[in-house]
């Protein structure tokens, strides 16, 4: 799984750190986001999926019908559940908008994760001393 290797890439690639430790300035739903952030406790890169904001801040989602019960879309299973909710549930328009926004951010981050992996490999392949 890409999500399993992404933290390692982010922790060991100075190229990735330098490029993504500032607002990206491109993209659609992550344009102003900083993908590479340092954990204040251990100095390692924070998993960018954990930086995705909660969808239902200020809304009671105690029922287990919404995603993981916490209102997060941080993995493929939650994304599939969210998409299913959009297709087959009678949702309040505010909740529907929040789910769509969350799915768009999650999907863009998933695509960006593939780009990070590619950029890391490309940097290593072009580097005289990759290790």
Residue ranges, per PLM feature:
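DEDD superfamily 3′-5′ metal-dependent exonuclease/proofreading module
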Residues: 1-131
């Amino acid at each position: 799984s890409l999500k399993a290797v992404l933290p390692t890439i982010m922790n060991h690639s100075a190229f990735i750190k330098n490029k993504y430790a500032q607002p990206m300035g491109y993209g659609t739903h992550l344009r102003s986001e900083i993908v590479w952030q340092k954990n204040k406790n251990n100095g390692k890169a924070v998993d960018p999926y954990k930086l995705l904001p909660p969808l239902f801040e200020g809304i009671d989602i105690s029922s287990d019908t919404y995603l993981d019960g916490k209102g997060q879309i941080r993995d493929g299973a939650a994304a599939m559940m969210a998409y299913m909710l959009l297709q087959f549930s009678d949702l309040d328009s505010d909740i529907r908008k929040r789910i769509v926004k969350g799915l768009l951010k999650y999907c863009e981050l998933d695509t960006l994760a593939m780009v990070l992996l590619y950029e890391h490999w490309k940097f290593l392949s072009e580097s005289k001393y990759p290790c």
